[in-house]
From Swiss-Prot:
Belongs to the RecF family. Transmembrane segments: none annotated. One of its GO terms (molecular function) is ATP binding. Keywords: ATP-binding, Cytoplasm, DNA damage, DNA repair, DNA replication, DNA-binding, Nucleotide-binding, SOS response. PANTHER family: DNA REPLICATION AND REPAIR PROTEIN RECF. This is DNA replication and repair protein RecF. NCBIfam families: recf. It holds the Pfam family SMC_N. InterPro entries: DNA-binding_RecF, DNA-binding_RecF_CS, P-loop_NTPase, RecF/RecN/SMC_N, RecF_2. It comes from the Bacteria. Its main location: cytoplasm. GO terms for cellular component: cytoplasm.
Amino acid sequence: MKLKSLQLVNFRNYKKLHLEFNGKVNLLVGKNGQGKTNIVESIYMLSFGKSFRTNKDKEMVRFNSENLYIGGSFSKYNKYSLIELIIGKDKKGIRINKVPLQKIQELLGNLNVVIFSPEDLRLVKEGPKERRAFIDKEISQIIPKYYKYLTNYNKTLSQRSRVLKNIHVDEALLDVYDDTLAKYGSYIYILRRDFIKKIANISENMHMNLTNGVERLSIRYKNQINITDEDTIDTVYNKFLAKLSSNRPNDIESKTTRYGIHKDDLNIFINDLDARLFGSQGQQRTASISLKLSEIELIKNEVEEYPVLILDDVFSELDEARQKLLVNNLSNVQMFITSAEVSHKKIFDEKNVTIFNIENGDVISIENGGN
C-alpha cells in the first residue's frame, strides 16, 4: 500500500499543507522544531486515529484555531481510498470515503502503518509495558476486534481497581468483574500467543540474516498464570478465573489486580541469553531492528501488502552499518524518514528519493527523485 497525498489544516504548526508523495522514499529534512515529526504524526493518525506523541487531541490543534483537519489518500489492493480526521477541542470525527465511522476500531487495518522511533531501539531493554504496547498495537492493525477486547479488558480492570480501593469491598461485584476480565483476557491471550508464534519464526530468520548467522534471536511469551501453548480458550478462561479468585485476598489487601494479561511480557533471548540483561547495546539495537522488520513482514503476510513505514529520527541513533542493515531489507516498502541531515539520502538509490525541506511549519522546497 502507498500513501499518495496528505492534506493538513491547522495541524500543529501547519496552517495549510498539501503534499504528494513518492511511492518509495520520502525524506523529510529540517532542523529540530521545524515540523518534520508533525507530518509523520499526522500520517500515524490516519492509521490509528490517535497520536504516538500525546493523548490529548487538543494539543494538536494549531494555536488560535478551533479545529484541525487531516486528509490522506492511499492505495490498497489497487483501490484508492480517502481517510479524513476532523478534531476540535471537544469532538473528533473520522471518515473513510466520506462515510463517518462510529468507533476507532473501524479505522484500524485500513491504512497499515509501522513506526520506528528511537524509543523502539530501546524495546529490548525497556520494561514490560513497552513490549506489551508493541504487541498490542500491531495485533490491532491485523485483527481490529483485538482493540475492542483490549479496551473492554482495561475498562473492567479500572472498575475492579476502584472496587478494591473501597473500605468495604463488594465481593459480589468483584465476581462480575473477574468473569469479564477472564473472558476478555482469554481472547487477548490467545491472539497474543498466535501473534508471538508468528513473529518469533520471522524474527529468528531475520536476525540470523542480519548477523550473518552469528546470533540466534528467540522470543517467548511470559505470563503469570501458568498458561501453556496447548491450552484452549476455555482452559485459559478457567485458569484466569481461578487465579483471580485464589489471589483475591491479596488483591484486596494491596488494592490492585496483581495478575492478568496486563502484567504479561515478551522475553527476548540472543543465543539463549536474556538480551535485556546480557546483551550489549549494539546487540539490543540489532534485535530491535529484527523485531521491527519482522513486524513489517508479518503485516505483509497477513494483509498481503506491505505497510507504510515511518522512520522518525532513527538514523541519528544508528551507526552507518546498522543504517544499511535496515534499509537493505526495505526495498518494497514506502518510507517516510525524518532527519536533520540531508546526507542520509546517500544510503538510498537517489532516484527513488524525494526530499522535502521543512522550515518553520512549511515545506520550502521539494527535490524529486522517483515516483
